[in-house]
Swiss-Prot record:
Name of the protein this chain belongs to: Outer-membrane lipoprotein LolB
Top-level taxon of the source organism: Bacteria
Organism: Shewanella sp. (strain MR-4)
Signal peptide: 1-25
Entry keyword set: Cell outer membrane, Chaperone, Lipoprotein, Membrane, Palmitate, Protein transport, Signal, Transport
Length: 214
């Protein structure tokens, strides 16, 4: 059995046991420690954020749906996939120089999160670019293919690897003072990812008022 089939089978088995056929439910975001919710004028101002949403992955052989929690900062990414009942099926903890993936009771490590996911799952998921796309931003190597009637980016393409990634922003929403995607679709060859952001919160260092102790 190849990596992709083994990986999706183990995750999907966990989800099926919990009775999750599609995404649903609402969970409280895990508490933050050194960062607090802030308001920003645009998503680019948020150097850190956390989101709660849904992720669906489709290939010709498999379909996978799960609840998604992601906490992102310049120093670290923490990503968790859970079932509707709250059962954790995958966790990824990554820094610029290391990555730890826990799935199906097994631990995997690498110096690069994107390389680790591809090695274990067979999926070439663009973890390095997703923080930009999730917030509706365009990377230096992204090409705009279409805009909507309001001039907002509708579709981009990234050709760092072939076949390229095509990213479609399906809908937008106001969150934390900024406008970020509500739903987006990523396609590369026969691999398709759909993300839905139910909650996106910009994070920053808490402000210290005059007279307060840090």
């Amino acid at each position: 059995m190849n990596n992709l089939k083994r990986f999706t089978k183990s995750i999907f088995s966990c989800i099926a046991l919990s009775g999750l056929l599609f995404l649903g439910g609402c969970e409280t975001l895990p508490p933050t420690t050194d960062l607090s919710p802030i308001t920003v004028d645009n998503a680019a101002q948020a150097k850190a954020w956390e989101l709660q949403g849904k992720l669906a992955i489709r290939t010709p052989e498999d379909k996978l749906s799960a609840n998604l929690y992601w906490r992102h900062s310049e120093e670290r990414d923490e990503l968790t996939l859970t079932t509707m009942l709250g059962t954790t099926v995958l966790t990824l903890d990554a820094t610029p120089n290391s990555a730890h993936l826990h799935v199906d009771g097994k631990d995997f490590r690498d110096s690069n999160a994107q390389a680790l996911l591809e090695r274990v799952s067979g999926w070439s998921i663009p973890i390095n670019d997703l923080p930009l796309w999730i917030t509706g931003q365009i990377g230096a190597l992204d090409r705009v293919l279409a805009v909507d009637s309001n001039g907002k980016t509708k579709q981009i393409q990234n050709s760092q690897t072939l076949p390229p990634w095509d990213v479609t922003f399906l809908s937008w929403q106001p969150q934390s003072g900024a406008e970020v995607p509500y739903q987006l679709k990523l396609e590369r060859g026969d691999l398709q990812l759909k993300l839905q952001l139910n909650q996106w919160q910009a994070l920053g260092k808490p402000s210290i008022m005059l007279g307060e102790k840090p």
